[in-house]
Amino acid sequence: MGTVSSRRSWWPLPLLLLLLLLLGPAGARAQEDEDGDYEELVLALRSEEDGLAEAPEHGTTATFHRCAKDPWRLPGTYVVVLKEETHLSQSERTARRLQAQAAHRGYLTKILHVFHGLLPGFLVKMSGDLLELALKLPHVDYIEEDSSVFAQSIPWNLERITPPRYRADEYQPPDGGSLVEVYLLDTSIQSDHREIEGRVMVTDFENVPEEDGTRFHRQASKCDSHGTHLAGVVSGRDAGVAKGASMRSLRVLNCQGKGTVSGTLIGLEFIRKSQLVRPVGPLVVLLPLAGGYSRVLNAACQRLARAGVVLVTAAGNFRDDACLYSPASAPEVITVGATNAQDQPVTLGTLGTNFGRCVDLFAPGEDIIGASSDCSTCFVSQSGTSQAAAHVAGIAAMMLSAEPELTLAELRQRLIHFSAKDVINEAWFPEDQRVLTPNLVAALPPSTHGAGWQLFCRTVWSAHSGPTRMATAVARCAPDEELLSCSSFSRSGKRRGERMEAQGGKLVCRAHNAFGGEGVYAIARCCLLPQANCSVHTAPPAEAGMGTRVHCHQQGHVLTGCSSHWEVEDLGTHKPPVLRPRGQPNQCVGHREASIHASCCRAPGLECKVKEHGIPAPQEQVTVACEEGWTLTGCSALPGTSHVLGAYAVDNTCVVRNRDVSTAGSTSEEAVAAVAICCRSRHLAQASQELQ
């Protein structure tokens, strides 16, 4: 599973020089022919190494990363990532310095690629013995061992993603995506297939590893199978989603559907350079592949996304947490799981679609009919999260064609908003993943008109914190989103609340674990609120009285969310963030030993109200939803006892979870209510009605 077909030993320099002398010119030429891909191996003198010497950077420690799945590792090839502001000349000089110092120690190295334009760094082939040396070089941020990535594939689908008003005898989308270009990083493609002929441009980019096995026979139909099928799903004449979109293909997977992290990185860099040289309209990049978690691949996706490119990727076919794989775990990427014709998670033998908090939504991914590379008119059925991602890439192309100025955050929010809700049987997922996995199946919006006038929000879960008392978890919104509220959740119920705090110029949601707890999640409510001015007001624990209170005191600001955290382990029957609209402006009220935080925002025409749903006796779950035209921005529990596991938003519904009431020993005095803050913009709603 390496990037070259065989492994080579690393010879000590004195022995290598002796062999070269013994072999003579003929032997040297033969060796040179055999090792043609080693033409840049460096034998440097000590004086050259000294000439490249630079003062080491103090106070910084570079780190080493490798794939957690051993069979996927590619030892001997490493991506050296340099600090963000490193110039190309410094990257090249750092690479030469590594070669010189390695040669002085008797090791041969080869610089395979120098990155620039997307991220600074270089790809090097070297012995693992040199890692300690490389980590100490100037400008080095971290080093990642290369690893493998894999294709993720094993006509109801078009009907499923089409809103009822558009359904007829055949699929006729409202916009074909003609203004959008889709880049596909996959295998090679049979570009003369009738489905995609004239719609796909095969670029000259190719970066793939050798196929495994000396007897592997490269049949064109197999080499082109995965890429041809996906190109047809995205923009095929008959079976495509975005029939008007144009495509460009880059080959990063070999005939066995295998590629490398480094090859994918170089492909993304190629796209960024093409974008700079030939600026066009909206770009969508489809990554129908998955490998182990990769910090460098996620970083490259982040850079490309912040340059205005929409990236869509497969969640993976391993029936596992998608956060353990890349690029599925990158927050800036739209990650897609797979469902079947009954809107249930796809099962692929003993495996199936990935799931979890890193998945944004699901899409059709079982028995998808598309172009076959067997002949220019053949069709074939394939399954997997690659096919699901291709559907979302097609939907994204049509949405961007209708609204070319959409940002990634706006596009993601629309994909979530217009998805089919609560149609997936969650029992298929592991119990600890059900609350984290979105119950959403992608669909086209019924109309783009008026969509921009809605208040869009989504729920973002953090990673699970550690079990120690001081452990915390942090949930973050995208750069273009506003954090309007913060909540927390613990399966054991042992937590110390949550708070909103500034970090790197942005508000984040931080949740606190408690002593004896098993860990906690932070849950952020992230919204698109143009021209918003938001802040957090905090009231420390009250010195006297029955509770702590805080409200929005700035003129024109409204309350969008409450949060609370405390240092004591057990507040007993306490009141964490609740709303008291009676007689006073909406305010957050909590236990006197807790700090209370109010999220207050001002935006054109923004108005918010409180909805509460209580029950006379405790239940395992209490919910309250916002009405049509209103959007849930805040979710909390009232009064909240030690039996409350937490509160979180699911679409437009506030959910409060309690411990199992049959074993928790609850009483009627500990009844729980779910409290929702529902907001809308009067200004935007009026503008929407005028358009309609």
From Swiss-Prot:
Residues 77-149 form the Inhibitor I9 domain. GO terms for molecular function: apolipoprotein binding; low-density lipoprotein particle binding; serine-type endopeptidase activity; very-low-density lipoprotein particle binding. Transmembrane segments: none annotated. Disulfide bonds join C223-C255, C323-C358, C457-C527, C477-C526, C486-C509, C534-C601, C552-C600, C562-C588, C608-C679, C626-C678, C635-C654. Its proteolytic activity is autoinhibited by the non-covalent binding of the propeptide to the catalytic domain. Inhibited by EGTA. Residues 450-692 are annotated as: C-terminal domain. Residues 1-30 form the signal peptide. GO terms for cellular component: cell surface; cytoplasm; early endosome; endoplasmic reticulum; extracellular space; Golgi apparatus; late endosome; lysosome. Keywords: Apoptosis, Autocatalytic cleavage, Calcium, Cholesterol metabolism, Cytoplasm, Disulfide bond, Endoplasmic reticulum, Endosome, Glycoprotein, Golgi apparatus, Hydrolase, Lipid metabolism, Lysosome, Phosphoprotein, Protease, Secreted, Serine protease, Signal, Steroid metabolism, Sterol metabolism, Sulfation, Zymogen. Its cofactor is Ca(2+). Monomer. Can self-associate to form dimers and higher multimers which may have increased LDLR degrading activity. The precursor protein but not the mature protein may form multimers. Interacts with APOB, VLDLR, LRP8/APOER2 and BACE1. The full-length immature form (pro-PCSK9) interacts with SCNN1A, SCNN1B and SCNN1G. The pro-PCSK9 form (via C-terminal domain) interacts with LDLR. Interacts (via the C-terminal domain) with ANXA2 (via repeat Annexin 1); the interaction inhibits the degradation of LDLR. Belongs to the peptidase S8 family. Crucial player in the regulation of plasma cholesterol homeostasis. Binds to low-density lipid receptor family members: low density lipoprotein receptor (LDLR), very low density lipoprotein receptor (VLDLR), apolipoprotein E receptor (LRP1/APOER) and apolipoprotein receptor 2 (LRP8/APOER2), and promotes their degradation in intracellular acidic compartments. Acts via a non-proteolytic mechanism to enhance the degradation of the hepatic LDLR through a clathrin LDLRAP1/ARH-mediated pathway. PANTHER family: PEPTIDASE S8, PROPROTEIN CONVERTASE SUBTILISIN_KEXIN TYPE 9. This is Proprotein convertase subtilisin/kexin type 9.
